[in-house]
Each structure stands twice: as structure tokens, then as C-alpha cells.
């Protein structure tokens, strides 16, 4: 009986959503007939559940999307997770949705995600308030603002690498720790370190419940996550209060509490927590894939190591620390980052929702339908990237065609922290490539799919510091 009740609790919300979305699907079809425009080609699958089972029956969801694209073309309809959807997989269509007609498509997230991160976070906004938040975040994470952070980021990188030395670790989990520490530094600066450990613990509890069923009952992951979110908000509110009294700080929090920005404490807290969320897993995923790809391609690793050794030798001779200018000289390593983001395509797609009926290339996208630009399909299109499955950083010696490479999204909702993400990758690999060796078990090959595509089991790796006489 207990198992049955649990089954009902888990399944009932999904069935309710399916039923509501099923009615919307029928409404969309009727609207298409009424206005004389056809829906995009495709299949809506079974009543209520659509093609959800087909999507998840494949260990690799990209197989599902590729099959649909090959059959129907770069724009097609489907029905997954209770939602009628239009998938777009051409650079032109992605630009239409994310840039030129972005006002017709709003970002969409489950209500439970908004509750966890905070309803006033930048992800969930449009219009003037979103533009205001984006200006603040972009200013705080601009090259001019983060260039002075190199020594502090380098210190975090060195501590991380030292803790891995001689250990067999889960690479993804260690990269998440590194990315979280950099995120907290960039948000709060170095003056709020006394709160950092409690912030981390609350955030980690929140993260565990992020993809859980939103059932707020004692003992559930969701309930624990919401308690952690409340405590996290209280800690951030305390830090905000102290910072307002000081009225200084070149970090993100300093930008938020600037009296000219007119943000409430609740708005600031939601956005601080949202930025922590955005800054952690995606960056850690790219770093994990970089370790994997460099280990699989010795010639590329050799080129990266030689580039970094040249910079390291110059730093040693001058007695100066690593600087922002040094990271601008890391051309080969930067191309490795780009190619890693293309091949791995950490963000395979993004969700939007049509706010009104939209016509695109003679097709109707009905109001309320989800629209998913498929970044991975665009990044793996051989018309734009020959031999797309091959890891070849040299392809970025020439800039890709517009809208064919969108690792940070595109338009007003693209990632405003992309320069910080690239900086922390460059700093970490400067020391990793010059000072450490790594290896993994051959049995650990493979890919696992969750919110992000990752090497199997988070890429367990052994890291060992090189001897001083080794290159």
C-alpha cells in the first residue's frame, strides 16, 4: 500500500500536467486550421504522454532529436513531458527565437524551479526588469571587472589541484567544488569568507532537491531543499545588510547593493542564488570534458602544455604572478575550450514558450507551445563543422559562421558570465597542464545523460604532480 501511495503521489502531478497540455495541443491544432497555417511537420505521439517514452527509451536523447530532424527537417513538432513542442535546429531559426523575435518567446521553467531559486531571479524575467538585472550582472562580470580577480582565482585553482594530488577522484564533483568556490568569490568577494562554508552546505542541500519531484512533505528531498533555500536566503540577507552599511565592493553583490540600482533585498537574494546555480554545473561540465578530451588526444595536450609552459617560464623568470594579459595569450587553450563546448554541447537545448501565435517559414507556432532551439544539433551539423564528431580545436583558428556556435546561448538571455567562466577554465588548465598528469580506467568510457551530458560516472581520474625535472 505504501508503494502504491508513493506511486500515486509521484505520478498524479505528471498526469495532471499531461491532461492540461493535451487540451492545449488540441487547441493549437484548431488554431492552425483556423488561421490557415499548418503546424510544423512531425508526430505528436500517443494521447497525453506524446513521445516522452520514445525520448527516454534511448540512452542518448540526441538520437531522438537527430532522427526527427533527419525525417522532418530543421523545424518539427513533437510532444514530450506533457507539452506540445516545436524543435528548431537551424542557425536561422535559433536566431529568430532567441534574438530577432525574442519578445515573442519567454523563458519557461517549472514552477518548482522558480520556488527554489527565487521568482525574481534573472532567468525567469523579461522586459525592463530583466534588462536592468542583465546590465548589473554583465557589468560585474565584464572583462574590465574580472581582470583583477586572476590572483584570487589562481589561488583557488592551486588549492584544488593540491587536494587532488595522488588521489583518485570524481572529476566532475571536484570541478563543481572549484566552480562553486570561484562563483562565491565573484559574488561576495574575499571579505565574506566567514559565511562561505554555511552557504556551501545550504546550497548543496538545495541542489540535491533541484530535480526531485516537487512534493513538499517532511523527509523528501524537495522539503529539505526548500528548508535549505530559506536558510540560504537568510544568510544572504544578513550579508546584504552588512554590505549596505559598508557601501563598497567590486564584486557582484557590490553591484547589486549599489543604491542607484534600487533593488530590494529579496530581489538581490534571488539573483545571488540564481547566479550560484548558473555558475556551477555548466562550467564544471566543460572542465570535466576538457580533462577527458585532452587525455584522449595526446597531441592536443602536448600543444596546450607547451603553450602554458612558455607562459610559466616567463612568469618564473620575472617573478610575477599570472595576469589577465597572460590569459589573453592562451590561444591554443582557448580553442580547446571552444571545441570542448562544441563537441560536448553541455546545453543541448533551451526552453522558450510562445507568448502569442507566431508564424515562421509558413508554419504556425501556437501560443503556449514550448519552443526548443537545439544547440547540439546546430553544433554537430556537418555543413557548419566538417566531421562534427571529431575533436579538432584547429577548426576555431577561423571564426565560425554567425549563429552556428552558441555555447552560452544567444540574445538577451545568453549567459552574462561567459567571460568569467572562460577565465577560470584558463587559469585552472595553466597549472593542470604544466604541473600534473592524469589517467583513468579504460572501463570508464561512455557518456551519461542527465541535466547535462557527462563522461560516465563523472570521469573518475587519478591526478599526480609531475616531478620537477619532467616537462
UniProtKB/Swiss-Prot annotation:
- Transmembrane domains' residue ranges: 1-21
Name the principal localization, coarsely classed.
Answer: endoplasmic reticulum
**Where in the cell?**
Endoplasmic reticulum membrane
Q: Identify the cofactor(s).
A: heme
Protein's UniProt keywords contain Oxidoreductase = yes
The record, for InterPro entries, names:
Cyt_P450, Cyt_P450_CS, Cyt_P450_E_grp-I, Cyt_P450_sf
What EC numbers are recorded for this enzyme?
1.14.14.137
Pfam families assigned to the protein according to its UniProt record, in alphabetical order = p450 (PF00067)
Q: How does it sit in the membrane?
A: Single-pass membrane protein
Which CDD domains does the record associate with it?
Answer: CYP90-like
Residues recorded as binding heme, renumbered to this chain, are 415
The top EC class is oxidoreductase
Q: Name one GO cellular component term.
A: endoplasmic reticulum membrane
Molecular function terms from GO: (+)-abscisic acid 8'-hydroxylase activity; heme binding; iron ion binding; oxidoreductase activity, acting on paired donors, with incorporation or reduction of molecular oxygen, NAD(P)H as one donor, and incorporation of one atom of oxygen
* Described function: Involved in the oxidative degradation of abscisic acid.
UniProt lists the family membership as follows: Belongs to the cytochrome P450 family.
Please report the name of this protein according to its UniProt entry: Abscisic acid 8'-hydroxylase 1
What species is given as this protein's source?
Answer: Oryza sativa subsp. japonica
Amino acid at each position: 500500500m505504501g508503494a502504491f501511495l508513493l506511486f500515486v503521489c509521484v505520478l498524479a502531478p505528471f498526469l495532471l500536467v499531461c491532461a492540461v497540455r493535451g487540451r492545449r495541443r488540441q487547441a493549437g491544432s484548431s488554431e492552425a486550421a483556423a488561421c490557415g497555417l499548418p503546424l510544423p511537420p512531425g508526430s505528436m505521439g500517443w494521447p497525453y504522454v506524446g513521445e516522452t517514452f520514445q525520448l527516454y527509451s534511448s540512452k542518448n536523447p540526441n538520437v531522438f532529436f537527430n532522427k526527427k530532424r533527419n525525417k522532418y527537417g530543421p523545424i518539427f513538432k513533437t510532444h514530450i513531458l506533457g507539452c506540445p513542442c516545436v524543435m528548431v535546429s537551424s542557425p536561422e531559426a535559433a536566431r529568430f527565437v532567441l534574438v530577432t523575435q525574442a519578445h515573442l518567446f519567454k523563458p519557461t521553467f517549472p514552477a518548482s524551479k522558480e520556488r527554489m531559486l527565487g521568482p525574481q531571479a534573472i532567468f525567469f524575467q523579461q522586459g525592463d526588469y530583466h534588462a536592468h538585472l542583465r546590465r548589473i550582472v554583465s557589468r560585474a562580470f565584464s572583462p574590465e571587472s574580472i581582470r583583477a580577480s586572476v590572483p584570487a582565482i589562481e589561488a583557488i585553482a592551486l588549492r584544488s589541484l593540491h587536494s587532488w594530488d595522488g588521489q583518485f577522484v570524481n572529476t566532475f564533483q571536484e570541478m563543481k567544488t572549484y566552480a562553486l568556490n570561484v562563483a562565491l568569490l565573484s559574488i561576495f568577494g574575499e571579505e565574506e569568507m566567514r559565511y562561505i562554508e554555511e552557504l556551501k552546505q545550504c546550497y548543496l542541500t538545495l541542489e540535491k532537491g533541484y530535480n526531485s519531484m516537487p512534493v513538499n512533505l517532511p523527509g523528501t528531498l524537495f522539503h529539505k531543499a526548500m528548508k535549505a533555500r530559506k536558510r540560504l536566503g537568510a544568510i544572504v540577507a544578513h550579508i546584504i545588510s552588512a554590505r549596505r552599511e559598508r557601501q563598497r565592493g567590486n564584486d557582484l553583490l557590490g553591484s547589486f547593493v549599489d543604491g542607484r540600482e534600487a533593488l530590494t533585498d529579496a530581489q538581490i537574494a534571488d539573483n545571488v542564488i540564481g547566479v550560484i546555480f548558473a555558475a556551477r554545473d555548466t562550467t564544471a561540465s566543460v572542465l570535466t570534458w576538457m580533462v577527458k578530451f585532452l587525455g584522449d588526444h595526446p597531441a592536443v595536450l602536448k600543444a596546450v602544455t607547451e603553450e602554458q609552459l612558455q607562459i610559466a617560464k616567463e612568469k618564473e623568470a620575472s617573478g610575477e604572478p599570472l595576469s589577465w594579459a597572460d590569459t589573453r595569450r592562451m590561444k591554443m587553450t582557448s580553442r580547446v575550450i571552444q571545441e570542448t563546448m562544441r563537441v560536448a554541447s553541455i546545453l543541448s537545448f533551451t526552453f522558450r514558450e510562445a507568448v502569442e501565435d507566431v508564424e515562421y517559414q509558413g508554419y504556425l507556432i501556437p501560443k503556449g507551445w514550448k519552443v526548443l532551439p537545439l544547440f547540439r544539433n546546430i553544433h554537430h551539423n556537418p555543413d557548419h563543422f566538417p566531421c562534427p564528431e571529431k575533436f579538432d580545436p584547429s577548426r576555431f583558428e577561423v571564426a565560425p559562421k554567425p549563429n552556428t556556435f552558441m555555447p552560452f546561448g544567444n540574445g538577451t538571455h545568453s549567459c552574462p558570465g561567459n567571460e568569467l567562466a572562460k577565465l577560470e577554465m584558463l587559469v585552472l588548465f595553466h597549472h593542470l597542464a604544466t604541473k600534473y598528469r592524469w589517467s583513468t580506467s579504460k572501463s570508464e568510457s561512455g557518456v551519461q545523460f542527465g541535466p547535462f551530458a557527462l563522461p560516465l560516472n563523472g570521469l573518475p581520474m587519478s591526478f599526480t604532480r609531475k616531478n620537477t625535472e619532467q616537462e
